[in-house]
Amino acid sequence: ADEAALEVALTIADHANATGTAETSEVRVLCLGPASADDVLRDALAAGATSAVRVDASTELDSQVVAVALAEHLGDRDLVVCGDYSLDRGTGSVPAFLADELSSAQALGLLEVRVPADNTSSALRVVRRLDGGRREILDVVAPAVLSVEGSAASLRRASLAASLAARTAPIETVRGPH
């Protein structure tokens, strides 16, 4: 799901940069975890993320504590895109807690995220899964937190040059909760 979230964020940024709807859209990848998470961050940089930050944490933490720690390091952002499933416990609750921490709108469990084809709307059209196989279509305006399912997008393949550059790219590491 995190790879799908990265692809959604890259697609939104590509669209905004191509259409001039934003000064410059950047994709900043942020994770909370031990040093071994740097490999995943390097993969994200190779795929097109502009910067990566790891909030250092070596122990398993409550989802709300994770959200608070991430919110402290998000900085100025319009949109946060998360995977809807975490590798640790798989609760998918971090995006909801994060939206609360950031006082942002939230759209969770998304199957599809569409950027507007024309520049008449700043809203993203999203499709989310409901119980019983039903779907809900929403228009989401930033600031917002989105969580996407793994099926929402397939991550683009990184070029060899980008992969090699990512191996030595800086990853900012900040102290997290312990």
Each PLM stretch: what is its role?
Residues A1-L32:
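N-terminal beta-strand-loop-alpha-helix module at the start
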Residues D2-E7, A37-D38, D88-V94:
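Short glycine/serine/threonine-rich phosphate/pyrophosphate-binding segments
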Residues L32, D38-H73:
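A glycine-rich helix N-cap at a beta->alpha junction
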Residues T50, D78, P143:
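Conserved acidic residues
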Residues D76-S86:
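Short beta-strand-loop elements within alpha/beta enzyme cores
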Residues R89-Q106:
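Short Gly/Thr/Asp-enriched flexible loops that form oxyanion-binding sites at enzyme active sites
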Residues L111-H178:
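Electrostatically charged, flexible surface regions
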